[in-house]
Amino acid sequence: MARSFGANSTVVLAIIFFGCLFALSSAIEEATKLGSVIGIDLGTTYSCVGVYKNGHVEIIANDQGNRITPSWVGFTDSERLIGEAAKNQAAVNPERTVFDVKRLIGRKFEDKEVQKDRKLVPYQIVNKDGKPYIQVKIKDGETKVFSPEEISAMILTKMKETAEAYLGKKIKDAVVTVPAYFNDAQRQATKDAGVIAGLNVARIINEPTAAAIAYGLDKKGGEKNILVFDLGGGTFDVSVLTIDNGVFEVLSTNGDTHLGGEDFDHRVMEYFIKLIKKKHQKDISKDNKALGKLRRECERAKRALSSQHQVRVEIESLFDGVDFSEPLTRARFEELNNDLFRKTMGPVKKAMDDAGLQKSQIDEIVLVGGSTRIPKVQQLLKDFFEGKEPNKGVNPDEAVAYGAAVQGGILSGEGGDETKDILLLDVAPLTLGIETVGGVMTKLIPRNTVIPTKKSQVFTTYQDQQTTVSIQVFEGERSLTKDCRLLGKFDLNGIPPAPRGTPQIEVTFEVDANGILNVKAEDKASGKSEKITITNEKGRLSQEEIDRMVKEAEEFAEEDKKVKEKIDARNALETYVYNMKNQVNDKDKLADKLEGDEKEKIEAATKEALEWLDENQNSEKEEYDEKLKEVEAVCNPIITAVYQRSGGAPGGAGGESSTEEEDESHDEL
């Protein structure tokens, strides 16, 4: 029997954006359009990038030699910093250093998680059009607001540049991962961040699914049930999958998009803040610099406690010249976070129930995310599965990027025979439906439905002579729409007037291979229909905003380039001046070969240049270049004369002919 909805009732639409079921033919078709496709794990606290190359995955180290990069962005009076450089200066520049932005992306400003985070971070989170924006001072004291997508785009750009430096070519295509329990708005916002970073996001896939690929890529043999337990810096996912000779089928997923290592750090920080207040009668909770130092040391202590039973948290001059030194035991750390650790078991139970499996049917428990190194978390998981040891065979920091890179290899065609049999069957994490009479959430696509999928249901009118139905689309698990999330709405007009219950209106939900949901409503009698793909109804960035942010990102990149050129020009001048200074005083080089006032001329030129450098710390590239030419105009003719007198070829101070022992030019530290 057809269900009814009133003139003002609604149909729920949800868009689930993630990667998915793909047939080999479609992968080959897509590969013809794509270049090399990198895999990026865009994490709350750290990010990682990999590429499928020469038959295997390469996890790519950044310019500091590290395979994971802090998801931090800092602004100073002269430049923008991303990664280690941003994190390292956070303690002295807290209000202008942004981190944990993944906890804001795709959320509304009034979300309770956002309001909680506002009190915990040193930078300002402000309300703009109902969304949380980050307000910071950039160069020259100018205040600017950035969307979470823009900050995420800066991190994605860093990962893109890391891959480009390794591969020696420009990259435009990427697979980007998201927590399995991310809702539609968070997925769409992540895709928008990719666009701002100049990337075509070829696929968004779920982090636990990517990790399962990393675990199961080389696993042959029979069917295996695995549970992926992914506890990272800011988010938590559990997925239950069946792996069978390259087919990865997700049976269920659950999680908490606001639970992770950052929460454990905050508990330790709160403990020490109270201790300081008690011992020193000093409240540091509003002192951003002190909190920055404490945050850094609490994170270090947490990591150390995974392998030690006690650490000492020591911070020189934490506040008012007072040095801080306190022990922290593993037992105390576990006590402070006991409820949070136990909270992770709830989603495990729900995922198991939804998958319809008994504990004994799980063949492997795969640990992903840095927080799974915590012994207490491992113990709780082991106890839940009645003594079964978790598998520690995958690198918890790199597994997600590894799986994303495999997916990238499939999409680009670079995966070849090694990946040709892989098939991913992922699921929609949240139920999608429409509102019917009385505000009831009528489900069309239940959670954990394999995607792509298409579901239709016939509805009817609630009032006599009703000619319009207003359809609202929701996602969520509650029975009433007021407790679910509205994704969008549209009207179907022109229904021929008829008694209530007579018209037949077919509503179709279709989630494609990318997890995008399209909703169509059609009046069967008249053939009149309307379609919707959710876009701006969710507070998503408009195309105009995205275009503006892309332009600004390009301007930032240009600015970063100029800063580097300026530093290089200054270094070139300094190197030349010091090199000349050393040569005129070195008997093995120029000291004994100079005649008349040649030495005085060089010394005067180098002295004047060094004094100019001291007074012009922040000059433009052109000024440094000009000053270098001035010094060279004095020194180079003298050097040429010296070499001609001694029968050698002429050469500048920095030239390879100046002495045989001259080292080749290196960037200075």
From Swiss-Prot:
Q: Name one GO cellular component term.
A: plant-type cell wall
Tissue distribution is: Expressed in mature pollen grains, and pollen tubes.
Task: Locate the motif Prevents secretion from ER.
Answer: 666-669
Which residue ranges are recorded for the region named Disordered?
Answer: 642-669
Could you list this entry's UniProt keywords, alphabetically sorted: ATP-binding, Chaperone, Endoplasmic reticulum, Nucleotide-binding, Nucleus, Signal, Transcription, Transcription regulation
Q: Any idea where this protein resides?
A: Endoplasmic reticulum lumen; Nucleus
MF terms from GO for this chain are:
ATP binding; ATP-dependent protein folding chaperone
Q: Where is the composition biased (Acidic residues)?
A: 658-669
Reported phenotype of the disruption mutant: Bip1 and bip2 double mutation affects the fusion of polar nuclei during female gametophyte development. Bip1 and bip2 double mutation affects pollen tube growth and length. Bip1, bip2 and bip3 triple mutation is pollen lethal. Bip1, bip2 and bip3 triple mutation affects female gametophyte development during the early stages.
Tell me where the signal peptide lies: 1-27
Family matches, as SUPFAM superfamilies? Actin-like ATPase domain, Heat shock protein 70kD (HSP70), C-terminal subdomain, Heat shock protein 70kD (HSP70), peptide-binding domain
Main localization of the protein described in the UniProt heading: endoplasmic reticulum
InterPro entries assigned to the protein according to its UniProt record, in alphabetical order: ATPase_NBD, BIP_NBD, Heat_shock_70_CS, HSP70_C_sf, HSP70_peptide-bd_sf, Hsp_70_fam
**What's known about how it's activated or inhibited?**
Binding to ERDJ3A activates the ATPase activity of BIP1.
Q: What induces it?
A: Induced by heat shock. Induced by DTT.
- What further fact does the record state? Baeckstroem et al identified BIP1 in a Mediator complex pull-down assay and suggested that BIP1 could be a plant specific component of the Mediator complex. However, no experimental evidence has been brought so far to confirm this hypothesis.
Assembly and partners? Interacts with ERDJ3B. Interacts with PDIL1-4. Interacts with BZIP28 (via C-terminus) in the endoplasmic reticulum (ER) lumen. Under ER stress, BIP1 dissociates from BZIP28, a transcription factor involved in ER stress responses. Interacts with ERDJ3A.
- Would you identify the family this protein belongs to, as annotated? Belongs to the heat shock protein 70 (TC 1.A.33) family. DnaK subfamily.
Q: Which PANTHER family match?
A: HEAT SHOCK PROTEIN 70KDA
Quote the function comment for this protein: In cooperation with other chaperones, Hsp70s are key components that facilitate folding of de novo synthesized proteins, assist translocation of precursor proteins into organelles, and are responsible for degradation of damaged protein under stress conditions. Involved in polar nuclei fusion during female gametophyte development and is essential for the regulation of endosperm nuclei proliferation. Involved in sperm nuclear fusion with central cell polar nuclei at fertilization, which is critical for normal endosperm nuclear proliferation.
Q: Which NCBIfam families match?
A: PRK00290.1 (NF001413)
* Protein name, UniProt field: Heat shock 70 kDa protein BIP1
What is the gene called? BIP1
